[in-house]
């Protein structure tokens, strides 16, 4: 008797990028697997818009580029293509070799947390992001309550490995809390980020 195993198809990065051009939805790519991204709630999208507006206006005239959730990021150590909810790059923007639509040198990354993705954003995705040498600061924005988590890279690694760096963790929960974004020398107020958000 022959048993047929239905193993998931393994895609090359080139196959993924080709499929992504013609896809109606955005997909992540992780080490051969294509992962459809779920649509966001209105609150999720409002928070992405508010955060990126605060970043864009705060950094006008400075040598940074601000990107929203449609900008693809390449993480070579994990063979990972993803679309962060927010991203700041110190100019010049570096593109993946042979691509005009995929960046590789973020300074600050942000994700808006949902019940289905918060563990992934805090753990696996953060671990992948930490392998990028330019990455300095990570923001996790809660969409169910007034709450933001900040991770800031500290000093030089002890062993020379990018994975051996220490990260400073801070939480913000009050409207008047000032979030100091040290990687880009910008301060934003938590209440401004959540100004038009209704949690009901």
What are these model-derived regions, one by one?
Residues 1-200:
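Gly/Pro/Ser/Thr-rich low-complexity, intrinsically disordered segments predominantly at protein N-termini
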């Amino acid at each position: 008797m022959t048993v047929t195993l239905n193993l998931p198809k393994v895609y090359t990065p080139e196959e993924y990028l080709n499929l992504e051009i013609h896809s109606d939805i955005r997909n992540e790519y992780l080490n051969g697997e294509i992962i459809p991204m779920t649509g966001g709630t209105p609150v999720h999208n409002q928070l992405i818009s508010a955060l990126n507006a605060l970043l864009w206006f705060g950094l006008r005239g400075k040598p940074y580029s601000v990107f929203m959730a449609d900008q693809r990021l390449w993480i070579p150590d994990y063979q990972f293509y993803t679309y962060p909810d927010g991203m700041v790059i110190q100019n010049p923007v570096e593109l993946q070799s042979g691509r005009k639509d995929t960046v590789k040198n973020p300074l600050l990354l942000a994700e808006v947390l949902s019940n289905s993705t918060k563990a992934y954003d805090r753990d696996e995705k953060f671990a992948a992001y930490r392998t990028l040498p330019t990455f300095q600061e990570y923001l996790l924005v809660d969409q169910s309550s007034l709450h933001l988590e900040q991770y800031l890279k500290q000093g030089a690694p002890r062993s020379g490995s990018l994975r051996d760096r220490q990260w400073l963790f801070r939480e913000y929960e009050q409207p008047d809390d000032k979030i100091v974004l040290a990687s880009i020398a910008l301060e934003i107020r938590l209440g401004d980020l959540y100004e038009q958000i209704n949690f009901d």
